[in-house]
Amino acid sequence: MRRFDYAGLENRKWGNEVVNYLSLIHEYKGKQSTYIKQKPRELERLVEIAKVQSTEASNSIEGIRTTETRLRRLMNERTTPRNRDEREIAGYRDALNIVHENFDYIPLTPNYILQLHKILLSHTDSGFGGSFKNVQNYISATDEAGKRFTLFTPPAPYETPEAMQVICDEYNRAIGEGKVDPLLIIPVFIHDFLCIHPFLDGNGRMSRLLTTLLLYRAGYEVGKYISLEAKIAKNKDAYYAALEDSQVGWHEQQDDPTAFVKYLLSTIIAAYRDFDDRIQIVSPTSLDTVKNAIENKLGKFCLLYTSPSPRDTERSR
């Protein structure tokens, strides 16, 4: 099994682009604290919108969808799931609510990750929610001729529990030492999580839940008000490209996570920009206008992602 050393990120040269990204996000974080104090009631209403968008977008990336009406009823818990897709959606809803409401009390450990995964799949009859994979999985794609091929082979099932323990320990150690910016440690951890691919199902969705959780715990709460999942869904080709670039040489510890770090940081910046723009116009009446405009677009995710490629489905689900 490969070694992990997150504390060593302190000595890595990230380049001006990454440094500029970090500075900008730090600046936005300062504004975030001011906004939360000034307009708490209005911002709470933005939370409702972001939860719906996040649940729809994160599932849409995996080819999981339902109608706009059914989505809203599921989010409000006014109906029960009718099929596999709706059960998946209900599970993400529940897991996201847990993250939103309890992030301060959810440390990064394999046990808590397993619990979150169990919640994610709690409405399905898969039978492996809350358990690491017990058979080898592969990150695959399908070429234009319809031939399937392997892009990346994650660690074997017997290596997975130890790998998950190590990356959690490394993350917590690096965060505790305070020498490396959490905004660098988080994407590197998520990248390693996706390379390990610890579950038979739900790896992509779990990676997005963990991204949100770790950002919240680090004080970056923009995902509460602006859906990070929706940003990823909008640019999922760039997401997959960054992940593939960063996976090269991973088993041999020759990988370079910079592409994925840049991608995630740019996504956070895009969310903060939207947050900054929206907060300038937010008021009890104007927020209703914003909410209605966003809700009118929710159903369009179904149109945007009606034909996910097998490549996309295999890589994240």
Name the predicted role of every residue range.
Residues 1-307, 311, 317:
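FIC/Doc superfamily catalytic core
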